[in-house]
Every structure is written in C-alpha cells, then in structure tokens.
Amino acid sequence: KTITEYVSRYCTDGVLEYVIATHADQDHIAGFVGTSAAKGIFEAFECRTIIDFARTSKDTQLYKKYVEKRDAAVAASETVHYTALDCWNNANGAQRSYELAPDITLNFLYQKFYEEEAKDENNYSVCFLLKQGNNNYLFTGDLEKEGEKSLVEKNDLPQCKLFKAGHHGSKTSSNDELLAKIRPEIVCVCCCCGSTEYTNDIANVFPTQDFCDRVIKYTDKIYVTTMYSETAEGNFESLNGNIIVSSNGGEVKVTCSGSNEPFTKSEWYLKYRAGNKAA
C-alpha cells in the first residue's frame, strides 16, 4: 500500500512504462505482489515492460506468487517481460538501451551472474544506468563485491551524479573498485540506520562503517531514508525520508521529505561514523 500510494502521486494515468525487479529477495519483490489487503504494483498499475533477473535460487512462496502475478499481467494485456540478460543481448524483443524521452535513456549493464551461478542471491541483481544528457545515475540492486568487480570489468562505466548504494550500505557492497570508477557525487541509501535487526555490532549496522569510510572519499552527499527508533511506531522514523533526485538536464537537485541535510551531518553519523575507522 505504501509503495502504490507513493507511485500514484507521480503516475496519474495508471500506466508504468517500465518496471524493474532487481532480484528475488523479499524486500525487492514483495511490493510487486501486494497482500490480501492491498494490491501490489503488478495489479495496481498497467506495467507495459517488466524487466527482472535472469537467475535466482529462490523457491519461496513469495517468489512463486511474484511469478504468478507477473505472468498474469503479461497474459492480461500488452505487457511484455524480459530478463536483464535479454536486454543486454538485444534478444527476444528486448533492448539494451531504451529511449525514455529526448536525451534520456535507460541502459542495461552486464555482469557475469546473469549467466553464472552465484553463492549469494544478491549477486543476481539487475544493474542499469540512467543517462540524462551528461548526467549519469547508477543502480545496482544488492550487488556485492564479486558482482561489482564483474560490472567494472564488463562495462565502460562513466562518472555518476548519483549512485543508489548497493545492498543498503552493507560492508560487502559499494566497494573501492566500483567507487573509483564512478566517482559518485550523490549516494542514496535505502536502510533503517542503526537498526540491530541483523547485528549488534555498531560498526556493521546499516549503513556500515566500511561503507561510510569508502564513500566519504568521494562525497559527503550521502542520504539515508530512515532511522531506527525504540519509541517510534514500527521502531523507525524518517531520517532523510523519501529522497527525490531531480534534474532538468543540468544541475542535479536533492529534495527530501525528511531532513534535507546529508546523513554526514546527522547526530548519528557524527557519533558513530565520523572519526571512526573500520578495523
């Protein structure tokens, strides 16, 4: 419901020309499926082109429901479905590059786990680059170190205005080899900052110390969606909130529903990340 309501603010005709599911982990496909109480993206909108992952090791009920809803959308309308590998190969009607508007293109990138077996589901992530004139915006899903290495080797990556941080700011993503190539000016992280859901080690809660140490060498314009809170409903509250990166083709602007100050100026960052170094 949260996702469909947010998208509806901008998609006023009920049609999404392109939707991308990066990989089959729950937090990346649940919004497409929906629940008994609320429609997911595949049912709430007409999705003209669905592009997703070429491989997965998942066999969960959620993944099966994702496939069911995706295929139902294709069967019921003029919707087409391709994998990222189809796009890279210009195969089965897919394209490596799609023109979204004059001087704006959606470009699919190659990484070896489109075709090879990965030890971690994250490395099956779809990777793509939005180009708007001379501005570049990179999205890598939850791609991790080995996948990022392949991404750098197999593509001529440009300097990027925006990098949507890999795997929620984990220590296994957004590695030096990739960052040195793209030299990002703005980095956005989708995570609940400071949450101990996965670890009690403060250095490894999202966004991790390793991640911050690597990114700060290129930019202090880091933005993070939410912050852990023991007292807030659901145990989280807005940090930067909804992060909107916009441009008319020249200057790139960041507007947030929460604080407009970069994460690097937050009390949490100054207390737990600034001046500290990963062991």
Residue ranges: model-predicted function:
Residues 1, 22-24, 55, 112, ...:
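Active-site metal-binding loops of divalent metal-dependent hydrolases
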Residues 1-52, 153-170, 183-188:
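Active-site metal-binding motif and surrounding structural segment of the metallo-beta-lactamase
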Residues 1-15, 83-162, 234-279:
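Core dinuclear metal-dependent hydrolase active-site scaffold
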Residues 20, 49-51, 83-86, 107-109, ...:
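Hydrophobic/aromatic beta-strand patches that form the interior of the parallel beta-sheet core
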Residues 20-22, 28, 53-65, 76, ...:
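Divalent cation-coordinating acidic motifs and surrounding scaffolds
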Residues 30-34, 62-64, 141, 175-176:
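Short, solvent-exposed loop/turn and secondary-structure capping segments
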Residues 34-38, 123, 204-208:
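Charged helix-capping and loop-helix junction motifs
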Residues 58-63, 69, 73-80, 151, ...:
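Internal alpha/beta domain cores that form substrate/cofactor-binding pockets in large enzymes
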